[in-house]
């Protein structure tokens, strides 16, 4: 209920009440939220919707209220941003798989289905690759079969990521904590550095 949400938010005063003259709070200037996006798992590190809030934590309106109350107290909210992989239930992945099922032997094209390039699909089953049901294609998922790896070289995906960060920053989020950054490009540290540089520049330009 709304009243319950307000009672819970009042507990932010224990973290920082926004009054430098008091000594009853911890004086914290930031809160790091572990993944809060919609996800089918308990840990939420497989995002099904990068623009939503998992119902476990309330609604998008509840989140906006939290951001406003934190801002009033001088508390920045840092979100966990999972970019190494998504959930297998993410519409991007589901649409890409449906597209592959309908090819009938034709070659895939990102022009026909942009989400095909969001992931690593292959006709060969390498290590950490799993079959796309109903096709002769495989997808990469190094952590778990239900966490398909994102193709961070894809320009369309990078544009999508930029939309995601702008969406949350515009709402009032103070920044992002990145998960599994060493695995963005496993075994290729310079590629990781280059991507993180791009992401940093992108986010700084949005703030």
Role assignments for model-derived ranges:
Residues 1-162, 170, 181-207:
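Acidic/aromatic-lined carbohydrate-recognition and catalytic surfaces
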């Amino acid at each position: 209920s709304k009243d319950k949400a307000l009672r819970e938010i009042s507990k932010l005063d224990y973290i920082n009440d926004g009054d430098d003259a008091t000594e009853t709070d911890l004086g914290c200037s930031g809160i790091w939220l572990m993944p809060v996006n919609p996800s089918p798992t308990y840990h939420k590190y497989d995002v099904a919707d990068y623009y939503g809030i998992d119902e476990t934590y309330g609604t998008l309106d509840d989140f906006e209220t939290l951001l406003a109350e934190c801002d009033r107290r001088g508390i920045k909210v840092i979100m966990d941003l999972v970019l190494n992989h998504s959930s297998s239930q993410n519409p991007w992945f589901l649409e890409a798989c449906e597209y592959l099922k309908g090819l009938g032997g034709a070659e895939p094209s990102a022009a026909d289905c942009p989400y095909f390039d969001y992931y690593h699909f292959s006709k060969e089953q390498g290590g950490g690759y799993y079959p796309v049901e109903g096709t002769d294609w495989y997808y990469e998922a190094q952590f778990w079969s239900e966490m398909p790896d994102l193709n961070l070289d894809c320009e369309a995906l990078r544009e999508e990521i930029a939309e995601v960060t702008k969406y949350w920053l515009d709402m009032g989020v103070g920044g992002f904590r990145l998960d599994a950054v060493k695995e963005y490009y496993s075994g290729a540290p310079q590629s990781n550095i280059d991507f993180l540089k791009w992401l940093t520049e992108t986010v700084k330009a949005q703030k």
